[in-house]
Amino acid sequence: MRRFVYCKVVLATSLMWVLVDVFLLLYFSECNKCDDKKERSLLPALRAVISRNQEGPGEMGKAVLIPKDDQEKMKELFKINQFNLMASDLIALNRSLPDVRLEGCKTKVYPDELPNTSVVIVFHNEAWSTLLRTVYSVINRSPHYLLSEVILVDDASERDFLKLTLENYVKNLEVPVKIIRMEERSGLIRARLRGAAASKGQVITFLDAHCECTLGWLEPLLARIKEDRKTVVCPIIDVISDDTFEYMAGSDMTYGGFNWKLNFRWYPVPQREMDRRKGDRTLPVRTPTMAGGLFSIDRNYFEEIGTYDAGMDIWGGENLEMSFRIWQCGGSLEIVTCSHVGHVFRKATPYTFPGGTGHVINKNNRRLAEVWMDEFKDFFYIISPGVVKVDYGDVSVRKTLRENLKCKPFSWYLENIYPDSQIPRRYYSLGEIRNVETNQCLDNMGRKENEKVGIFNCHGMGGNQVFSYTADKEIRTDDLCLDVSRLNGPVIMLKCHHMRGNQLWEYDAERLTLRHVNSNQCLDEPSEEDKMVPTMQDCSGSRSQQWLLRNMTLGT
């Protein structure tokens, strides 16, 4: 009898929840006829919750681990897109994700009247599951009254499932999804320009084709643009593992910068920016540069500021070019810490670049240097001499744009927007540091912080053999300085702290010696024990302690 009563209770409870679900679904469907935008915006999220199996692979952003028996097949599939395709295909297209926002972000209230947005996603031979998961995350986690359309720009994909199959599939989605086909492989930059030209939203939001938007991602971006239409905003970019598709929250304590080679890099948010925000981490972070894959911009302002440089090829450098242009021409660039979007970070690209990756990036970087970096372009050319050899085309239109917009000089950008830049404003020399005795050069060997500086045959190609002897008497290689903490070394590379101490060196232009002030020893040739690293020895004036600093008059 008790079992019978228990069964009736369970059945009644289950039936009640089914009826509640049906009622809510019908109720919110009817809200299409009402005026309350916020209620209507809940419909896609509600449907997703009702239909989802919360225990499936990858739910709540959990890692998907492939059994040992399938490892070989997994590795083969990995090569197609340079991420774990097998894991991705096991995960639901509308999988659940954790709410990774700061607690203060969860209670923020945004204005009712926000600008709407077109979401532009460029893809080339993208995997079905990652592309559709990107689209579903946009639709399911965006209020539909703010979502004008999703524009998919196909950059000449060759895979059949990305043609008619995709077109038929997106017809049934709840938000208008438009597919634009590029006639030939054109690259991210020109494909985005095509998508932007076709957009109708007041704001354009660019996303990569392997992203996942989280709860509340869109409103903070649009609210900031509503406050200032000349503000270009980026979400915090969370990490989706290319191996397991685990969703990992990104840090709100990093912002965008660049190194000597004009490679985008993440750096800790400086104290001055924390002070400006009065310690409130839910406020946007002013960032010198953006990663470039994910951002929102007022559509009219995008046109006014000069869209993208259409003379650049494929991708690479366009993010820094746009970052410099926005700041130098009166706009601002921010990371909105209450917005989170995940991105699959790959260790390698599965695509080829016409002419080779190096050629494309060198051309793009040369264009941005010629237009935006003023005299600092010469610093970059010493670091990367190969850039000077490429044909970078005509930049007269971009220079005219800069003149018409009355943009500020690059020195202003470094002093006011990016004072933490790794580019030394004053230096005595820039280039190789060559040992007179061995005719070898100091070389950072591509090593990281807290590793020994090396010495190697001089190659004259810049890169790892470019060091700057700064006006602060540091020996710098990018953001690392040569540091000696005890007698007889070793000489290691540490973050430059600008406090002199272990990083203070005196160069004697007559004796050609580099004396470490704290230890009162001189930089010397390698020992027999390790011929790949320089040593520290008592100063003797020998040829092995003599060093020639390239371009010694430059920057004095």
Curated annotation (Swiss-Prot):
This protein's GO CC annotations: Golgi apparatus; Golgi membrane
InterPro entries named in the record: GalNAc-T, Glyco_trans_2-like, Nucleotide-diphossugar_trans, Ricin_B-like_lectins, Ricin_B_lectin
Disulfide bonding pattern of the chain: C105-C338, C329-C407, C441-C458, C481-C496, C522-C539
Subcellular location: Golgi apparatus membrane
Domain of life of the native organism: Eukaryota
Chain segments carrying region Catalytic subdomain B: 284-346
Tissue-wise expression: Specifically expressed in neuronal cells. Expressed in fetal brain, whole adult brain, cerebral cortex and cerebellum. Not expressed in other tissues tested.
List of residues binding Mn(2+): D208, H210, H343
CDD domains: beta-trefoil_Ricin_GALNT13 (cd23467), pp-GalNAc-T (cd02510)
Cofactor: Mn(2+)
Membrane topology: Single-pass type II membrane protein
Ricin B-type lectin domain span: 428-550
Function: Catalyzes the initial reaction in O-linked oligosaccharide biosynthesis, the transfer of an N-acetyl-D-galactosamine (GalNAc) residue from UDP-GalNAc to a serine or threonine residue on the protein receptor. Generates GalNAc-O-Ser/Thr structure also known as Tn antigen, which itself is immunogenic but also serves as a precursor for the synthesis of different mucin-type O-glycan core structures. Contributes to the synthesis of O-linked glycans on mucins and proteoglycans of the central nervous system. May promote neurogenesis through glycosylation and stabilization of PDPN.
Family according to the record: Belongs to the glycosyltransferase 2 family. GalNAc-T subfamily.
Identification of the protein by name: Polypeptide N-acetylgalactosaminyltransferase 13
Source species: Homo sapiens (Human)
